[in-house]
Amino acid sequence: MPELPEVEVVRRGLHSHVVGKTIGAVRVHHPRAVRRHEAGPADLTARLLGARITGTDRRGKYLWLLLDGRDTALVVHLGMSGQMLLGAVPRAEHVRISALLDDGTVLSFADQRTFGGWMLADLLEVDGSVVPEPVAHLARDPLDPRFDADAVVKVLRRKHSEIKRQLLDQQVVSGIGNIYADEALWRAKVHGARIADALTRKQLTAVLDAAADVMRDALAKGGTSFDSLYVNVNGESGYFDRSLDAYGREGESCRRCGAVMRREKFMNRSSFYCPKCQPRPRL
């Protein structure tokens, strides 16, 4: 699933190419792509017709397009395999929605697994920010200028469960998925099974700082692409997968100490870690 860096790469691409453009005809090619828009496909297409895009924004793994003179936004969730693509014509297999812009560009939403989609949602003011209603419950992410690491540390120190579980909880801190959780924990030298309330403030701060740092590094390299499911708006893959220190490196040498990296099951996922740098907690 695209995590914060990948979604931010897409948002930046959209901001550069669609802000100031007006939406013309919109076609929904697969109803699942608009299943979160409760009023249905016809309502979505009618309300988008003639809307001018004035900006883009993101929180965690959600992004949205701001529309001129409206108190609603077009919310996009990429799900497992969603792609926002720009071109003269719909340019990908699995195109679920296409929108013609006034300069002739087609904005396409492609989604092989159909877990993502578009919806129009009301904008709300929450904690000093204006966000779409489906995003209102999400915590700020580590790249948000108003992210308060000290406040998150206080929350984590009240959580009696694994630190990795907390990093994946979008109501504690948003935008972090399995890949960047493992990378942050490796950088901070903390095993994901450590209990959050047993970690010191210094350790928890180190984990959050590492999460922000690794996502900035990933963003600079276009995100992480293991296959063709994640690409930017031009259809190009990111290349941070070449720089991963933990995720996917079972059996390889730790880049820091040389120990053999391990993999274990966690929450129906795989966790990758160094047994020397990140010793597993004793039961």
Swiss-Prot record:
It catalyses: Hydrolysis of DNA containing ring-opened 7-methylguanine residues, releasing 2,6-diamino-4-hydroxy-5-(N-methyl)formamidopyrimidine; 2'-deoxyribonucleotide-(2'-deoxyribose 5'-phosphate)-2'-deoxyribonucleotide-DNA = a 3'-end 2'-deoxyribonucleotide-(2,3-dehydro-2,3-deoxyribose 5'-phosphate)-DNA + a 5'-end 5'-phospho-2'-deoxyribonucleoside-DNA + H(+). The keyword tRNA processing does not apply. It comes from the Bacteria. Its EC number is 3.2.2.23, 4.2.99.18. InterPro entries: DNA_glyclase/AP_lyase_DNA-bd, DNA_glyclase_Znf_dom_DNA_BS, Formamido-pyr_DNA_Glyclase, FPG_cat, MutM-like_N-ter, Ribosomal_uS13-like_H2TH, Znf_DNA_glyclase/AP_lyase, Znf_FPG/IleRS. PROSITE patterns: FPG_CAT, ZF_FPG_1, ZF_FPG_2. Involved in base excision repair of DNA damaged by oxidation or by mutagenic agents. Acts as a DNA glycosylase that recognizes and removes damaged bases. Has a preference for oxidized purines, such as 7,8-dihydro-8-oxoguanine (8-oxoG). Has AP (apurinic/apyrimidinic) lyase activity and introduces nicks in the DNA strand. Cleaves the DNA backbone by beta-delta elimination to generate a single-strand break at the site of the removed base with both 3'- and 5'-phosphates. Monomer. Belongs to the FPG family. This is Formamidopyrimidine-DNA glycosylase. It comes from Mycobacterium avium (strain 104).
